[in-house]
């Protein structure tokens, strides 16, 4: 199996798990705040089958991976019934925040485990350096690095969850950032915002990758440097 295929498998595994946690966080938060809609549909679960969208969760990320583009996508939106919330505005706001917050929390947990691997486990530091080099498409002989799979999963666990955290906070429908922003807009402005927001998202999706790609490599280099020096 080629190194590129191995990288893709690692990324897909992390992405699918991140999607599942993200959407189940929405569903669980909505349930706790009074709306059982997602719970009744079986969405308070880490089972990826309940959350994955064929195009957004599988085909689009694979297209991005095989074409050297962005590893990005979406899961099936978490269904909510706002009138069920004990406080509609608070319920919508906290439910929207729960998804990105779960990605940030997962990135934090992965970082903590990576630091444990680096400082407390023999061979951990070398495996982390190998994971970062492999992610940068440097060909290595990984046969002797028993901890490499763990280091690779944790590395992508940080990187992919941070990307999803930032991506989902973009204030364009249907992303979580739009639901958060809409809670602070007057009703008339909010209605207009929701109508034009989807077109804005499509434009962002088409052009945003090219624009953000300018910053991605320098930011990734800074990210890898920070991991190596922590």
Identify what each model region corresponds to.
Residues 1-230:
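Hydrophobic transmembrane alpha-helices and their immediate loop junctions
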